[in-house]
């Protein structure tokens, strides 16, 4: 995962530390100096801030005190509850925080070797498709000798303050962290993909089936090393930090630190009883203000759970900001959940593995419509197909597909007034099985994302076997920006960008000819096929000038629905297109019949129901069955 970590701004941690040790000085980062520029990008500075090294704040500074825990963190003055919640989630995953905080034992203060300390640290974050190594010095902003931003329970523990400083450096300054998105931080810590879920819109509080499905997915994400966050939407500024009667706080991002089914009852009977309760453990980054409803720390509901089960769950009676809730109550009181999947691409794992395709792209503007790549969403039909297009394949009868589009992070450009995200999204279309060139007309929409001005947009969808085109867009045309497209499938999807609008002219075109006609053939299905005891296991093959497209086998039916399409760029207009129907057998497939399609561009009857014919008979003789075919032809190769 970290075989190729890129030094951020070309600062090499090892070389810088070596140089400081040689010169016996503490590192001072010239790219993130101890000045107001590193604190704010606008507005008037508050109280006089003094930058201090940990040794100037306490006697015995440490990266970690008694290990790392989600209890370590407390939010400071900046409105980065979202980042602190993500850190709380990170702290509960040793395999993840050790990647964000690399070689932590070497970075830790060593009281026995005080001269080895160089005042320099480094941290890894996933940034727009690659891992970056961010170097910082250890000077931290304080007021009255107190850290003003993220800090630990222990006065001499500094891991969270240093991680926050490195993240602020990526963002441009501390103020740029104000009002961010937990989903972004979770992705930056893991390289995974975040899926936001609107609990209110999905009506999870009242729909038990949907709620149970969501809990199972959260259980799977948590058990496989993912990170989860929950929050209550603050609709107005007055709502921010508003505490509800139940003890929860609006506008706060709560870290989910455990997901489990809790066994109710006592003794041996409880072990064999099937009654279990879906429960979630959460933590408030403020470190206090807990839930006071059912299953809160001191509630009588805990009497239903055995002492051993409570100990296993780590139930404590203290106002430490961590508490349990039933998942039903979570769905009733919270409005949003963010699941960050840590995508498993290792083939050595016992869990499901994914194949990832990762492509960089951009929305760009050009006077030539063929070169313009900033067409806006489908509302703008005249320019929509000018957007970037990416083709991928689903190679199983049905597969779960995860798609994420991320625009280049904008926080570091806030100082120049360019820090706002574009509203982005994407549509997915099922296309012909042999498409190699860009789409120019609408086809069946297989799925679509929401459009939102967040850094990332995610979609999970189940799709049948076939070929698909993703069209990522900005909501309005005329906007420019870079993006990263990530597509996860069970088997390799051969995802790639479609760059050409039509077959290219080559040196062979004058000798072999160039296409004069484009024809799209859509075989919908067949009816009345030759009887067999179990029904036909049929498939179709569409042939044209040496190119062919084959459908999947439709088992046990004489009225199959093939729903297969092919696109053909034709040079020999007098040569018909052939559609053959076959019956799949163990030893040898059986020919059931065929039809020939002239597919002239002036044929206005686009939908045809044709009788199957024998292929060898000179006289046209009908065989059992008909095939339904939709045909579209044009002399403009950019018509389809």
UniProtKB/Swiss-Prot annotation:
What residues does the Calpain catalytic domain cover?
26-343
Q: What is the effect of changing residue 243 to L?
A: In VRNI; largely mislocalized to the cytoplasm whereas the wild-type protein is localized near the cell surface
Q: Does the keyword Endoplasmic reticulum apply?
A: no
Give GO cellular component annotations, separated by semicolons. Answer: cell surface; cytoplasm; extracellular exosome; focal adhesion; synapse
Q: What's a Gene Ontology MF term here?
A: calcium-dependent cysteine-type endopeptidase activity
The Enzyme Commission number assigned here is 3.4.22.-
Please name the Pfam families in this protein's record. Answer: C2, Calpain_III, Peptidase_C2
Q: Which family does it belong to?
A: Belongs to the peptidase C2 family.
Explain the purpose of this protein. Answer: Calcium-regulated non-lysosomal thiol-protease.
The protein's name in its UniProt record: Calpain-5
> What organism is the protein native to?
Homo sapiens (Human)
Gene behind this chain? CAPN5
């Amino acid at each position: 995962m970290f075989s190729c970590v890129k030094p951020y701004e070309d600062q090499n941690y090892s070389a810088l530390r070596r140089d400081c040790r040689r010169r016996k000085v503490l590192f001072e980062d010239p790219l993130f100096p101890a000045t107001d520029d590193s604190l704010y990008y606008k507005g008037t500075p508050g109280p006089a801030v003094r930058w201090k090294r940990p040794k100037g704040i306490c006697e015995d500074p440490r990266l970690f005190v008694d290990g790392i825990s989600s209890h370590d963190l407390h939010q400071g003055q900046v409105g980065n509850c979202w980042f602190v919640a993500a850190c709380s989630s990170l702290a509960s995953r040793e395999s993840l925080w050790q990647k964000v905080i690399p070689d932590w034992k070497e970075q830790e203060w060593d009281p026995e070797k005080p001269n080895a300390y160089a005042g320099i640290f480094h941290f890894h974050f996933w940034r727009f498709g690659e891992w970056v190594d961010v170097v910082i010095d250890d000077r931290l902003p304080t007021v009255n000798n107190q850290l003003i931003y993220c800090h630990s329970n222990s006065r001499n523990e500094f891991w969270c303050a240093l991680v926050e400083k490195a993240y602020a450096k990526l963002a441009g300054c501390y103020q740029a962290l104000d009002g961010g998105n937990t989903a972004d931080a979770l992705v930056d810590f893991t390289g995974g993909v975040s899926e936001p879920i609107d609990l209110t819109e999905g009506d999870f509080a009242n729909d038990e089936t949907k709620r149970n499905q969501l809990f199972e997915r959260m259980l799977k994400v948590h058990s496989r090393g993912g990170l989860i966050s929950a929050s209550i939407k603050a609709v107005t500024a007055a709502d921010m930090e508003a505490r509800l009667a139940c003890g929860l706080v609006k506008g706060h991002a709560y870290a989910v630190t455990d997901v489990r089914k809790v066994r109710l009852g006592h003794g041996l009977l409880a072990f064999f009883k099937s009654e279990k309760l879906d429960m979630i453990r959460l933590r408030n980054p403020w470190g206090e203000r807990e839930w006071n409803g059912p299953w809160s720390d001191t509630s009588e509901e805990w009497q239903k759970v055995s002492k051993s089960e409570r100990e296993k769950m780590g139930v404590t009676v203290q106002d430490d900001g961590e508490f349990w809730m039933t998942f039903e109550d979570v769905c009733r009181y919270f409005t949003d959940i963010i699941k960050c999947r840590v995508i498993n691409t290792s083939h050595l794992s016992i869990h499901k593995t994914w194949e990832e395709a990762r492509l960089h792209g951009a929305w760009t503007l050009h006077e030539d419509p063929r070169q313009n790549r900033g067409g806006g969403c489908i509302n703008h039909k005249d320019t929509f197909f000018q957007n970037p297009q990416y083709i991928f394949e689903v190679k199983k009868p049905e597969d779960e597909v995860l798609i994420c589009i991320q625009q280049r992070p904008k926080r570091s450009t806030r100082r120049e007034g360019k820090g706002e995200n574009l509203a982005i999204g994407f549509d997915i279309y099922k296309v012909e099985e042999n498409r190699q060139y860009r789409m120019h007309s609408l086809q069946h929409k297989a799925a679509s994302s929401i459009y939102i001005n967040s850094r990332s947009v995610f979609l999970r969808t189940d799709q049948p076997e076939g070929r698909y085109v993703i069209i990522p867009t900005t909501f309005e045309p005329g906007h420019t920006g870079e993006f990263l497209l990530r597509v996860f499938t069970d088997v390799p999807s051969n995802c790639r960008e479609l760059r050409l609008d039509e077959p290219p002219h080559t040196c062979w075109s004058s000798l072999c000819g160039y296409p004069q006609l484009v024809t799209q053939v859509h075989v919908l299905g067949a009816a009345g096929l030759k009887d067999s005891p179990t029904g036909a296991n049929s498939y179709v093959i569409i042939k044209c000038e040496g190119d062919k497209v084959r459908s999947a086998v439709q088992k046990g039916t004489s009225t199959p629905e093939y729903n297969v399409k092919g696109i053909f760029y034709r040079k020999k207009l007098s040569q018909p297109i052939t559609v053959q129907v076959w019956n799949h057998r163990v030893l040898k497939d059986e020919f059931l019949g065929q039809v020939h399609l002239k597919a002239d561009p002036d044929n206005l009857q686009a939908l045809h129901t044709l009788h199957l014919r024998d292929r060898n008979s000179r006289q046209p003789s009908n065989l059992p069955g008909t095939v339904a075919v939709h045909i579209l032809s044009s002399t403009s190769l950019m018509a389809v």
